């Protein structure tokens, strides 16, 4: 069942209730796809920016995309020259890791720096710090022991700063709620009600002290990890957002003001761990006045900087491999499409920051780049007859039977064929079983959804919301962007786990839904200008005569908010039989692709925020 009914509802209020109630009943896309189609304004890649129809070299009249040129070429490797691959830096990093482990171990009742009045917040602080700095992978055992200790003192009113604190503390409770929930502990958001007055407002002082502002920062961060139906989390988000925005207008520029700005900018569902680490490095510990605490922050900061820069030496090797693949595959002959392989690799590097996940990073970049070319081929360049031939050949999966295809399609067929087979071999090595047929079916479903949309474009058909949305979740590309790359990781995905993170799981369905819905809100105007009418917005308006564009946008945004809460629950449900660590990779793919729509369609206009992301997380080292 799609989010919006195709039957016009009596009022906006009724429609909103219908949308909310259907969030947890989203029907996974069936492999049997109807014979209609449409444009992909909601995918994370956008179709043509031009309505021009020049005659190509083969004498066929074709549209062109009008995209800006590729921002990166082979010269990008020169910018990745870094000395941090030398053994001396790694050895220094290992020593710092041991010192930080000692910091974890020193937080005990016997340590003079801590007391029963502050030990809980100190424990939460160090866990939160290593996670935001992107170095937590070294301290999994220490983090688990620390959070077990904090959780053992958790109450229905939250926690105080220490185990002997008389009253609960907002900062400790908010940070504890967020951190414990992200690690799968069963903690209720109801604890926040104890910090509200009779009017539902969170208590705060007129003076707006630094300590209070940090408490509200953590309240805001906690509110983003809301589950469905948690009204107090919605109230916390509204209050903390208003409070922090107003505080930014009053306080002087400082590391605190920069941190507040970064936190407001980095919402949970577009937050990229490597970008968060890069931003947090710039503000971490700058205002620390306590000498002993300063020494701790300096060690954490040095390790974070080393880890960030050392990773760049690995990125250089991987990017060199990706550029060779791009050139050897003949992508430079494909002139009708965008080329975003560097941008996609950057996104992969921002979510899979552990060095051992090289195959994931490269596989994700390759899959997404192929998706982009196919998108432009189906939306812009290919004729309907050519596209039907290509779709049929994908189902045959036989490279010897492609003589019927035009030259450019033969090239794309072989690129897709070789890539899927290569990643299947890598997945077999990682998983110990053959997954080729599974991957082929995913790609067939995806290509079918593209073909369906191409037919909608060709016939001028505007589908109902249900028709559009069910097909659109598949054509969002989320599944094929995630499936094979995660299977190449050295993480076991047995069948019972895989079915809970891939099709037809609710996790996959919600992640695809968010990408479709958010993409449509960013791209529908450009699509309409190109003559591609169908989108969540236009289909909603068709199903609900009298609804304005603003009504549709408001409604879709409300639905996105609720779908996000549903995705939070699917990821973090403490009663789930699937480990968070298995689900998080699919969730992170959703975050990465969602990031491209954070400000605009960053996949068609990639020379602003997307370019900045490449510069900040791939090309620029952190200064010491």
Curated annotation (Swiss-Prot):
What cofactor is needed?
A: Mg(2+); Mn(2+)
Q: Which reaction does it catalyse?
A: (2E)-geranyl diphosphate = (-)-beta-phellandrene + diphosphate
Pathway annotation from the record: Terpene metabolism; oleoresin biosynthesis
* Binding-site positions, Mg(2+) 2: 375, 379
- What top-level branch of life does the organism fall under? Eukaryota
Catalytic activity, EC:
4.2.3.52
* Binding-site positions, Mg(2+) 3: 527
Binding-site positions, Mg(2+) 1:
375, 379
Question: Residue span of the signal peptide, if any?
Answer: none
Task: Give the motif span (DDXXD motif).
Answer: 375-379
Q: Name one GO cellular component term.
A: chloroplast
One GO BP annotation here?
diterpenoid biosynthetic process
Enumerate the subcellular locations listed in this protein's record, separating them with semicolons: Plastid, Chloroplast
Q: Where is the transit peptide?
A: 1-48
Co-factor binding details: Binds 3 Mg(2+) or Mn(2+) ions per subunit.
What is the UniProt domain comment for this protein?
The Asp-Asp-Xaa-Xaa-Asp/Glu (DDXXD/E) motif is important for the catalytic activity, presumably through binding to Mg(2+).
* Family note: Belongs to the terpene synthase family. Tpsd subfamily.
What protein am I looking at?
(-)-beta-phellandrene synthase 3, chloroplastic
What is the organism field in this record?
Answer: Picea sitchensis (Sitka spruce)
Which gene name does the record give?
TPS-Phel-3
């Amino acid at each position: 069942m799609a989010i919006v009914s195709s039957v016009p509802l009596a009022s906006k209020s009724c429609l909103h209730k219908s949308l909310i109630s259907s969030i947890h009943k989203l029907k996974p896309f069936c492999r049997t796809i109807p014979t209609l189609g449409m444009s992909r304004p909601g995918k994370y890649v956008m179709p043509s920016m031009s309505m021009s129809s020049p005659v190509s070299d083969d004498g066929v009249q074709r549209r062109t995309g009008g995209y800006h040129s590729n921002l990166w070429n082979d010269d990008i490797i020169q910018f990745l020259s870094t000395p941090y691959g030398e053994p001396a830096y790694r050895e220094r990093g290992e020593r710092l890791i041991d010192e930080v482990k000692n910091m974890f171990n020193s937080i005990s009742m016997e340590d003079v720096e801590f007391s029963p009045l502050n030990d809980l917040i100190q424990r939460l602080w160090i866990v939160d710090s290593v996670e935001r700095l992107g170095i937590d992978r070294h301290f999994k055992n220490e983090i688990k022991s620390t959070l077990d200790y904090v959780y053992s003192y958790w109450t229905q009113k939250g926690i105080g700063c220490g185990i002997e604190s008389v009253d609960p503390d907002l900062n400790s409770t908010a940070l504890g709620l967020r951190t414990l929930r992200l690690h799968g502990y069963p903690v209720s958001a109801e604890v926040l009600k104890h910090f509200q007055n009779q009017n539902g407002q969170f208590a705060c002082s007129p003076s707006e002290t630094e300590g209070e502002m940090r408490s509200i920062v953590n309240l805001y961060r906690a509110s983003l990890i809301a589950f469905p139906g948690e009204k107090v989390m919605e109230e916390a988000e509204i209050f903390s957002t208003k409070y922090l925005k107003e505080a930014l207008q009053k306080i002087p520029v400082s590391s605190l003001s920069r941190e507040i700005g970064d936190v407001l900018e980095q919402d949970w569902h577009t937050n990229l761990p490597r970008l968060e680490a890069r931003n947090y490095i710039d503000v971490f510990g700058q205002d620390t006045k306590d000498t002993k605490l300063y020494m701790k922050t300096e060690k954490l900061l040095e390790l974070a900087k080393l880890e960030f820069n050392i990773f760049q030496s690995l990125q250089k090797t991987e990017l060199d491999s990706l550029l060779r693949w791009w050139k050897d595959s003949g992508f430079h002959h494909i002139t009708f499409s965008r080329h975003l392989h560097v941008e996609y690799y950057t996104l992969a590097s921002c979510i899979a920051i552990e060095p051992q996940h090289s195959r994931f990073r490269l596989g994700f970049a390759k899959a997404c780049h192929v998706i982009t070319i196919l998108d432009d081929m189906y939306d812009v360049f290919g004729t309907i007859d050519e596209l039907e031939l290509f779709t049929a050949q994908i189902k045959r999966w036989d490279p010897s039977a492609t003589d019927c295809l035009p030259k450019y399609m033969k090239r794309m067929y072989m690129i897709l064929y070789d890539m899927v087979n290569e990643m299947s071999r890598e997945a077999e090595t990682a998983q110990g079983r053959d997954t080729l047929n599974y991957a082929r079916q995913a790609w067939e479903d995806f290509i079918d959804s593209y073909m369906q949309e191409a037919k909608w474009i060709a016939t001028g058909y505007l589908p109902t919301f249900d028709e559009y949305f069910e097909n659109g979740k598949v054509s969002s590309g989320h599944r094929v962007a995630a499936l094979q790359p995660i299977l190449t990781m050295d993480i076991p995905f047995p069948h019972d786990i895989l079915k809970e993170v891939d099709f037809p799981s609710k996790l996959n369905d919600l992640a695809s839904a968010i990408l479709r819905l958010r993409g449509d809100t960013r791209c529908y105007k450009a699509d309409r200008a190109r003559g591609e009418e169908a989108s969540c917005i236009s289909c909603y308006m068709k199903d609900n005569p009298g609804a304005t564009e603003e009504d549709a946008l408001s409604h879709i945004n409300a639905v996105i908010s609720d779908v996000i809460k549903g995705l939070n629950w699917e990821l973090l449900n403490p009663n789930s039989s699937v480990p968070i660590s298995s689900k998080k990779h699919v969730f992170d793919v959703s975050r990465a692709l969602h990031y491209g729509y954070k400000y605009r369609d960053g996949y068609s206009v990639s020379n602003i925020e997307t370019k900045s992301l490449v510069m900040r997380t791939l090309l620029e080292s952190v200064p010491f």
